[in-house]
Structure formats: C-alpha cells, structure tokens
Amino acid sequence: MAVLLVLTGNAIAGSLLDLCLSRAYARQHFTWKYTVSPNNADNPDTLRRVAPAAERNRGPILDVLSRVLPKAGVVLEIASGTGQHAVHFAAALPTVTWQPSDPDAASRASIDAWRKHASLANLNAPIALDVRSAPWPVPDSLAAIVCINMIHIAPWEAAEALFQGAGERLTNDGVLFLYGPYKRDGAHTAPSNEAFDHQLRVTNPAWGVRNMEDVVQLGRAANLWMEEPVPMPANNFCLIFRRTGI
C-alpha cells in the first residue's frame, strides 16, 4: 500500500525543547495564536486547540492537495499541531487513512480530541514522532510527503533533514509538497513577508523566510524536482516536488 507522509506545523528545531518553544512563541506572536474550545474542565473537548491560521488556509491547501496527492494509501502527518488540518483533510480525502503525529504531548492531546470529536473512520490516533530522529519510524516506500508552515520557523538544518528523508523514503514519482512563504531570487514577494521575516530573525537568527531557489537546490540534491510553484492566499506558495531517479 502506498504511504503518504505529511508534515504540518513545525518540524524539529534542534531539540524537542527548541521545538516546543518555537511553536509556542510563533503561535503567541504571529499567525499561530490558538484558543481552547470553551467547555468545562471535565470535557475532553477542552483539549481541542483552534489556530485561526489553520482555519483560514486549510481550504486553499486542500484544493492543491486534492489535485497532486495520490488517491489512496496511508497519510502520516508529522508535526500536526492542533489537529485541525488532520481532521479537515481526512474528512475530505476518505480514501486515505490519515495518521497524525507530533513530538509535543500537548499537541497530541489536541489532535486526539479533534479526532474523537470528528469520529472519522480514516483518522487514526496521533503518534509521537520526531522528524529529525533517524531513522523515521515509517514505511520505506512513501507516496507523498507534505510539509505545511515549517521550514521558516526552524533552523535550515530541519529543511535539509526533510529533503534527505524525502529522498530516502519517497517512491519513484512520489510527491513532496511544501506550503509557506518564500523569497524569490532573494527578494520578498510582499512587504508583509519582509516584516514577518524580520520578526522571525529577531526571535531566532536561525529562522526566516527561505529563498525558493535554495529550497529547489535541496530538492535536486535528493532527486526531487520542483514541478510548479503555486501562488496561494496571503503571499504564500505551494511547492510541488516529484521524486525521480530510483
């Protein structure tokens, strides 16, 4: 069976502590600020976190995923964050089995609360998984990898590890799908992205909006060739790579 590996949110930023701190800071100060479902403390729904950015971007992202991803297989989602993407994508793609994951226990609790709330037959309970801990505890043959809003809020080494893992795990013609803001030819595509990049680098000099051309070079080194950059709302892009040369 084909397997789809999906990374959303933040991959590992050096260590689990770095990851938790970077995710918490980004959600507090940038677009990932989330709220908790307003229920009483005894209700497991209180664990369901809501990130406004995930609510806004899930529809446009799904439109592209529906077009480029294989139609069947197991979807392993890494760094699932709140779990909103997992629920939305699993509901819209019922022919795949969605396997969310996150290295952060609180995030896994939110994902599981969303899973129980949605009660989808094709959405599994979240697992603990650190993307920078090799070898990845996933099957060797992956049909696709999807990474949403990660490489700009993590050190460059996280992007390198992502492409290395993708090159090792994707089957021939497998897809690597990235979503987020990018510079083109070293220039920001909008003033808001430039301001966001400045905020990121003040917070952590290892973070920042990446040059699309540098990301493309990582792909080439892993036999992953970009087919198309898809412009998205709010000055983001989807980058679609395909595995060749197996």
Regions found by a protein language model. Name each.
Residues V87-A134:
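Class I SAM-dependent methyltransferase SAM/SAH-binding core
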Residues D173-Y182:
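Conserved beta-strand signature within the Rossmann-like core of class I S-adenosyl-L-methionine
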Residues W136-I145:
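A short acidic, Gly/Pro-enriched loop at the edge of an enzyme's catalytic core
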Residues A72-G81:
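Conserved class I S-adenosyl-L-methionine
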Residues A206-N223:
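Short alpha-helix
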Residues I153-A166:
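A short, conserved alpha-helix within the catalytic core of class I
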Residues T189-R210:
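Conserved Class I S-adenosyl-L-methionine
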Residues S37-P70:
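Class I SAM-dependent methyltransferase Rossmann-like catalytic core
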